[in-house]
Swiss-Prot record:
Subunit structure: Part of the core SMN complex.
Source organism of this protein record: Gallus gallus
Subcellular location: Cytoplasm; Nucleus
Organism superkingdom: Eukaryota
Stored PANTHER family: EUKARYOTIC TRANSLATION INITIATION FACTOR 3 SUBUNIT I, SERINE-THREONINE KINASE RECEPTOR-ASSOCIATED PROTEIN
Lineage: Eukaryota, Metazoa, Chordata, Craniata, Vertebrata
Region of interest called Disordered, as start-end residue ranges on this chain: 311-350
GO CC annotation terms, alphabetical: cytosol; nucleus; SMN complex; SMN-Sm protein complex
Key words of the record: Cytoplasm, mRNA processing, mRNA splicing, Nucleus, Repeat, WD repeat
A Pfam cross-reference name: WD40
Primary localization class, coarse: cytoplasm
Gene from which the chain derives: STRAP
Name of the protein in question: Serine-threonine kinase receptor-associated protein
Example GO BP: negative regulation of transforming growth factor beta receptor signaling pathway
PROSITE patterns registered for this protein in UniProt: WD_REPEATS_1, WD_REPEATS_2, WD_REPEATS_REGION
WD repeat feature ranges: 12-56, 57-96, 98-137, 141-179, 180-212, 221-262, 263-302
Length: 350
């Protein structure tokens, strides 16, 4: 029988966590960046949640954060009317890009040479990072503040969302190709390169659209208002979180709810799958990030599954070893409905 989820809690932020993003898989693993209203985006090891560093320099809430594919650069969008580009290895601030209003979204091209931004001034800006002093290319057409702006996988198109509209733009002509109107305010948007799928959430709806045409593929209705959703890299399942503090996991093909569980102590603002699909991260109003296993009970990262030899699971104990010298023996808890045992995971202190 199924074992319960045991999330790894990553503390360190002092205000709500509003955005997060993973890098691609690098020779050193993959990495996770989080944006927070405390104005201090943080970088972590993606599979363990271990804190690596904090990017210091913004003077207001940070609304958006991203990493390039090889995790050498980070970009952040903030309420101080700036977007910043950082050296993700040293933590140094490389470029500050001034805007005329709050910046909500940032995204690198595949080669990391250009940065796309969007925010409250309703304009998309494209910066050539080799010429940061040059004026950016500006794309206008949104009628309200931009919540999310993303490149397509070939960087030839741009996808952006404002209040109740998602727009598709041609990069070469800087013109709108198509607009998609939805019934309620868009709360999140994710681009999935495999299959060119756009995941959009609004109200209780989780909708999947072609990123090339904006035609709807399918949609699911959740029991509560959803703030964010993420599709597994292999499109097996999806996760979503929202106002009821719960995470929901669905079968992508059938729409069947596979799991639902609480772990946060406030509304969930953002969820994302890791690039290998083994875990997903969630960020909440409670100021924490939590990492969850896609396959509960699998040994991965800091999770270690031990199946007891004896039938009495309550007597079973196990051991989780943390990276480096930080070993900590922690109590094992038996699943209420299973003889298997799962590890409770230690809180990672930033």
């Amino acid at each position: 029988m199924a074992m319960r989820q045991t999330p790894l809690t990553c503390s360190g932020h002092t205000r709500p966590v509003v955005d997060l993003a993973f890098s691609g898989v690098t020779p050193y693993g993959y990495f996770l960046i989080s944006a927070c209203k405390d104005g201090k985006p943080m970088l972590r090891q993606g599979d363990t949640g271990d804190w690596i560093g904090t990017f210091l320099g913004h003077k207001g809430a940070v609304w958006g954060a991203t990493l390039n594919k090889d995790a050498t650069k980070a970009a952040t969008a903030a309420a101080d009317f700036t977007a910043k580009v950082w050296d993700a290895v040293s933590g140094d601030e490389l470029i500050t890009l001034a805007h005329k209003h709050i910046v909500k979204s940032v995204d690198f091209t595949q080669d990391s040479n250009y940065l796309l931004t969007g925010g409250q001034d309703k304009l998309l800006r494209i910066y050539d990072l080799s010429k940061p002093e040059a004026e950016p290319d500006v794309v206008s057409g949104h009628t309200s503040g931009i919540k999310k702006a993303l490149w397509s996988s070939d960087d030839k198109q741009i996808l952006s969302a404002d209040d109740k509209t998602v727009r598709l733009w041609d990069r070469s002509t800087m013109t709108e190709v198509k607009a998609l109107n939805v019934a309620m305010s868009v709360s999140s948007m994710e681009y999935v390169p495999e299959g060119q799928i756009l995941v959009i959430t609004y109200g209780k709806t989780i909708a999947f659209h072609s990123a090339e045409t904006l035609e709807q593929i399918k949609s699911f209705e959740a029991p509560a208002t959803i703030n964010s959703a993420s599709l597994h890299p292999e499109k097996e399942c999806l996760v979503a979180g929202g106002e009821d503090f719960k995470l929901y996991k669905y079968d992508y093909n059938t729409g069947e709810e596979l799991e639902s569980y609480k772990g946060h102590f406030g509304p969930i603002h953002c969820v994302r799958f890791s690039p290998d699909g083994e875990l997903y991260a969630s960020g909440s109003e409670d100021g924490t990030l939590r990492l969850w296993q896609t396959t509960v009970g699998k040994t991965y990262g800091l999770w270690k599954c031990v199946v007891p030899e004896e039938e009495n699971a309550e007597a079973a104990k196990a051991r989780t070893t943390l990276p480096g010298t930080a070993e900590e023996e922690i109590e094992e808890v038996a699943s209420e409905n299973s003889d298997s045992v799962y590890s409770s995971t230690p809180e990672v202190k930033a």
